Amino acid sequence: MKQIRNFSIIAHIDHGKSTLSDRLIQVCGGLTDREMDAQVLDSMDLERERGITIKAQSVTLDYKAKDGLVYQLNFIDTPGHVDFSYEVSRSLAACEGALLVVDAGQGVEAQTLANCYTALDMNLDVVPILNKIDLPQADPERVAAEIEDIVGIDAIDAVRCSAKTGVGVDEVLEVIVAKIPPPEGDPNAPLQALIIDSWFDNYLGVVSLVRIKHGSLKKGDKFKVMSTGQNHTADRVGIFTPKQTDKTELKTGEVGFVIAGLKEIHGAPVGDTLTLAKNGAEKPLPGFKKVKPQVYAGVFPISTDEYENFRDALNKLSLNDASLFFEPESSSALGFGFRIGYLGLLHMEIVQERLEREYNLELITTAPTVVYEVVMTSGETIYVDNPSDLPAINNIEEMREPIVEANILVPKEYLGNVITLCIEKRGTQVNMVYHGNQVAVTYHLPMAEVVMDFFDRLKSTSRGYASLEYNFIRFDPADMVRLDILINGDRVDALAMVIHRSNIRHRGLALVDKMKELIPRQMFDIAIQAAVGSQIIARSTVKALRKDVTAKCYGGDVSRKKKLLNKQKEGKKRMKQVGNVEVPQEAFLAVLKLNE
């Protein structure tokens, strides 16, 4: 057990952690050169395409250190993006240490900082590593000072390496062995194993990645899942070298997989504890905090007969993604679908792309909304995540919107733009600290403004240099109203949105104009209105297509033309009473894109 090291890598997007992990695998001979592939651990197509890590993965490597001993390194890959912080906290819970990888050219970023604090809170040993020293703009001295200044850990003797060229990778391995403590645990105590991650394999059923804290798990053991109390038999246990490799037993301190032929997707929830069915442990391990979705959106299949497939796809995906929440929803405009809760906008995009790709679904998503706290005149408090569930204005005593604390790290020269953006988004400044060339600003911002397009705007005003990390702090009273879109007097539920009263005029006009371009002309006039309660704040009309009825009159009397025009008018009026308007899918998507 003294020769085991469990660690993960904390790094910002693009600071090179997936490349570094490739090098570690190569040096330790986990894969032959032929099987080596760039970013081995990012196995999803989507991960490779966007160059980000979404799912936590694990690898067990054998490393012969300079002291002649062979160490077993269990490396758990973590995502770097703020939306996946939950995946990160899970990965860290299984480790004793973490490598903080920082790009020697760019320096520390907000999300790295957030994940690093998570690691320090969990009492992990954090070892700084400066990567990309082969780049011409690398400045390891400055970055080392920045790490000490901003993060507050010793970085003078940080290992300098370049994962791309392979310089310094051996030193990284030596540092892992020297600086990260071996796991603690009692091999003779009853089994306690933490489920770090689980996913569904079409052939094997549920595969769970576990970290054995105490005791050991052998192939063929009967074990019990502590939260559900169900017993299963371990058909296969083993490790990833990144390939699945079977073993007869997982010992204390090791990280590996367990397959028990579970077909029930929720049979092994992430963060749960496994113990043996006979003489098991008394109490479960402390898991992770359950995350609450922050952003909700309605998602509907484009053709209604896809609904069943959509439901199965969501069930399979939610096994893989413990933070996904969904419930059925129906809309008069879009039919049946689901209301899905996400951790943030990137998470939302990724989930939608995965559904479309991995399950061949065609989906349409309504505008994302956050959860509002509504105090009714009757005195009860309700939580609303769907604008069309909002009670009537006269029943609402007060609406409270979620406020987040956003920590932004930005180079000095872009500070002005960032502050302007935060003020426009109704933010209040809480703190500002200068660290060398970087400024750390803290703002309290309404979450609704952050989920819409804050991140993109932040990146564009700062030329991509600013980085953002945010978390929910409280609900604050705010003057929020529901903006409805009426088409020929009928409310379209899928287009409703909750916005601040100061924005309604501007937003209403923009929406109505956009809808006017997108709704195809019919045989009768279509009135598009934006309303708050019963008050109409903007309107435009899609003009009717009409035949030139007077074309056949040659010269002739004006009363003859009048008669024909009036007859046409009557007809159009009748059509308007019975006709209904199809709102095309583009119109819904346009509402999402309104802010751009």
Swiss-Prot record:
How is the protein disposed in the membrane?
Answer: Peripheral membrane protein
MF term (GO), any: guanosine tetraphosphate binding
User: Which keywords describe this protein according to UniProt?
Assistant: Cell inner membrane, Cell membrane, GTP-binding, Hydrolase, Membrane, Nucleotide-binding, Protein biosynthesis
Is rRNA-binding found in the keyword set?
no
SMART domains hit by this protein: EFG_C
Domain tr-type G, first and last residues per copy:
2-184
> Where is the protein situated, by its record's location annotation?
Cell inner membrane
Q: Which domain of life is it from?
A: Bacteria
What are the EC numbers?
Answer: 3.6.5.n1
Catalytic activity field? GTP + H2O = GDP + phosphate + H(+)
Listed binding positions for GTP are 14-19, 131-134
Q: Which GO terms describe its cellular component?
A: plasma membrane
Q: Does the keyword Membrane apply?
A: yes
Q: Give a GO biological-process term.
A: positive regulation of translation
Q: Which Pfam families match?
A: EFG_C (PF00679), GTP_EFTU (PF00009), GTP_EFTU_D2 (PF03144), LepA_C (PF06421)
Q: Which family is this protein grouped under? A: Belongs to the TRAFAC class translation factor GTPase superfamily. Classic translation factor GTPase family. LepA subfamily.
Per its UniProt record, what PANTHER family does this chain match? TRANSLATION FACTOR GUF1 HOMOLOG, CHLOROPLASTIC, TRANSLATION FACTOR GUF1-RELATED
This chain's function reads: Required for accurate and efficient protein synthesis under certain stress conditions. May act as a fidelity factor of the translation reaction, by catalyzing a one-codon backward translocation of tRNAs on improperly translocated ribosomes. Back-translocation proceeds from a post-translocation (POST) complex to a pre-translocation (PRE) complex, thus giving elongation factor G a second chance to translocate the tRNAs correctly. Binds to ribosomes in a GTP-dependent manner.
Entry protein name: Elongation factor 4
Recorded source organism is Shewanella baltica (strain OS195)
